[in-house]
Amino acid sequence: RDVVKKPDGTLAWQPKAINNPEQMLSIAQHISKPTNEVCMRCHVGSGGGMNFKRGDIETAHAGADRDFDVHMGSNMQCIQCHKFKDHQVVGAGTQMSGKDLPEARGQCENCHKGRLHAKAENDRHGKRVYCTTCHITVFAQHDRTDMRRDWSQAEAVAGEGRFEPKIEFQKDVKPVYTWWNGTGEIALLNEAVRVGPNGKVGMYVPNGSRKDPKARIYAFKYHTAKLPIDTTTGMLIPIQVGPVFKTGKI
């Protein structure tokens, strides 16, 4: 990609081949299903750096063995579980309020069916406790993950000539657990924020309870941040990360 200046003076990324019809044709003629390597080019570094965002998709997954990740260590491909239909993906992360295919969900049970445990008691637990709650006890085992961002403070990044918000990292993080039915409440920019019982604003709050028959106990990465709020409207103030990276100020 190249950085180009738009008519209004702002800068934007532009594919190198956009003004090269022959190269664009070649790209169009060499489309194939994405491999793990292709998926990881974006998802490993989402959120600003390696393993920053989710904490469970790390650089080490590229050459993982079965002890590190039983699926990728068995040479499975991402798209075997994260399936697509007409370029729409099945399922969504817990931080997403919208879904391409709301009626379809990616679940462990899509492959793992029938009696799965030596003890029937464990299978009964599976009706209310999701698989990853027990089978993935920690995350960020290789690369540290972003657990808190303070946008009121900016720190210079050594050797890069830019700033970024103050970030607290952790490794070998134990998830937090709560009931979830697959839906949640998300904070929107055009609505006043809602302060929860813990005194904090929930950017995404999972829906579900013990009394909800559709809910199970899931493991979550609990990320916190310090964000600006308009004291008059009670709304979140959108952050333009470009100026923050350049000046260290919101």
Language-model features: locations:
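C-type cytochrome heme-c attachment and multiheme electron-transfer modules
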Residues: 1-250
